[in-house]
Amino acid sequence: MKWFAAFALALLALLQPAVAQTGKPRIALVSIHVAEMPTIARAGARRVEGAVSVDFYGLGGGLVPSIEGIDLGRYNLVLLDAPGPRALNFSTQLEAAKARTKVLVVGAGTPIAGNIDPQAHPDVARYWNNATEENYAGLFAYTARLLGHPVAVPAPVEFPSLALWHPEAKGPFSAIDDYLAWERARFNDGASRPLIGILFYRSLVLADNAGVVAALIREVERQGGLPVPIWREGSRDRASKLLGDRRIDALILCANRLDYADAAAGVAEAERLGVPPLMCATDYRRDVEAWRKSLGGFAPDATGELALSELEGIVEPMVVGARAVATDGTAAYAPIAGQVRWRVARAMAWARLHRLPNSEKRIVIPYHNEEPGEADIGSDPDSYLDAQGSIVALLHRLRAEGYDTGTDPIPGRAQLARRLAEAGSNVRPGDDATLRRRIGQGAIAVPLRTYLDWYAELPKALRDTVEARWGPPPGRIMAVDGKIVVPVLRFGKVVLAAHPLWGPQADAGALAEKGALPPH
């Protein structure tokens, strides 16, 4: 029977998760988040490599291998962070691993359960939700001790879910008044500077990966604003709670949504903040050079998120950063300097507008008129919207809120529709008489010399592309007697302006172009 005992022991060894020859437990961390930015998790693993061996995997994509084809059962323990449906593609593989080894779910929203109860190990969530290099090391040490190995385990270091952070400060501020006192003291005019909120995720700071946020903060200061940088752990953490009765003048939102779970709650938060959220984004897939070479700016897979962001009133989406991967495999997010300047300049303009009395604000309301003439005016025919009626309602609302809409009675829907058709519609190329009549009816007439001064500010490469397709300025669209004409109706400081004509109106051959058409 000795042979049977030996065989049983050998079989048992094969069925048990493998242990390295050094006796160290082997752990697999499967995480879609760490896969994208594994730098600090790897650094944490190096801190405890004498006590535990950690391998990193994702679900495809990112900077670590996929678990596809990997025998996870050979590890002593698998840490799983895989929110969303992608994990279901590997459900058979993960269930097979659970039959042979321990699986502990660490990421919220993971659709596959483990075989270790997370509630029995509350420190695991504390390590994971406060993901610094130190806490990753603590997590890996904790799992080694969970497996029965005598490893020293540091307590998790926790951070507030809402705080104010500045790269020059020693640590985060939990109170807005303390932060403002510190920040204002750094500038002679600190008390009068507009307050520019910057809302971002805490994980960037904890991962030592807040270069884009730091660039925004410093650019706000350079342009004469006072940054109010707020980190949040998740999208349910409300910046308005931290601000209290303080009011910011503009908000730069480093995310696609104010509340990913509830758009209505996001709208309510925007209303509490009292300013429109100005979106900025980091391209997580491409580096700066690849982003510069792209025609679209945003990656195609961002289209859905951009559309959803509009549900919360988030406007002006801009890319301000991209991924940078070093030769040693470390990764970070790098700011795109020109984009950062532009994002902040727009925020500063919004701040000036926010401080301006309504009666002094000047507003342009564009309306659809892509085809020349009266028939295609107001809104796109496919949308079935009553643009004229909506504009009338908007003019009444503006007047009620103190905007300068002139002294004349606001026209009714039919009267406005008639005025738009008679004086506010675009004109087909070559109809110079009607263009001159538009100027007499109050249209804006931009002298060519003035336009050329503006045009010269654009990059030469862009100007060359534009002129190769449409010819030199002013072109054939809405131009007469050395002037570019924009039909408008004026109501005090509120201007209704026709949408520019579609480029192929001047050159039907443009429709046969391959690729993107340049602006006209």
Predicted segment positions?
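Bacterial N-terminal signal peptides
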Residues: 5-14
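An N-terminal assembly and electron-transfer interface module characteristic of large anaerobic redox
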Residues: 20-520
